[in-house]
Amino acid sequence: MLGNLLFDASSLIYALKLRNLKLLYDNYTQWLAVYEVINALWKEASLIGSISFQEALKLVKIFTEVVEFMKVLSPHPYESDILTMANKLKVSVYDASYVVLAREKGLLLVTEDDRLRIKAKSLVKTISLNDIL
């Protein structure tokens, strides 16, 4: 299973919070996830207050180091497929991009988003981080 996992932002954030980063190495994410993770950490620190800003900075630093050891995919040239998938599944374009990349690259989609996991399961194999810990 290792080496064929595509982590979405929700699973990346969960792995960061658990400090369980080993599974990320030599696996996949996409460059949009980098912004999604940073945005989620900013939101938790600045708007929700569930973590301090210093903790958010620390997690971003760790995440930046981990990404260096991941294979980072691009949604290009799949833009039309992504829009079509978003329309078909009634999910955001961001979520659809993970489904399309998992399908095109033959990867297992790792997501903590139950709704996405259910909607995508007929198209790609989906799992939660908890399924592989």
Give the ranges of each region predicted by the language model.
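Metal-dependent nucleic-acid phosphoesterase active-site entry motif
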Residues: 1-19, 29
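Acidic, PIN/NYN-like endoribonuclease modules and their adjacent C-terminal/linker elements
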Residues: 2-4, 29-30, 99-133
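Non-catalytic, well-ordered alpha-helical scaffold segments
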Residues: 10, 35-38, 57, 80, ...
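Phosphate- and divalent-cation-binding pockets in alpha/beta enzyme and binding domains
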Residues: 14-15, 36, 81, 118-119
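PIN/NYN-family metal-dependent endoribonuclease catalytic core
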Residues: 16-50, 54-58, 71-73
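Amphipathic alpha-helical segments within well-ordered protein domains
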Residues: 38-42, 64, 83-86, 99
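Membrane-interacting alpha-helical segments
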Residues: 51-64, 115-121
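Active-site neighborhoods of divalent-metal-dependent phosphate/nucleic-acid chemistry enzymes
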Residues: 69-108, 112-115
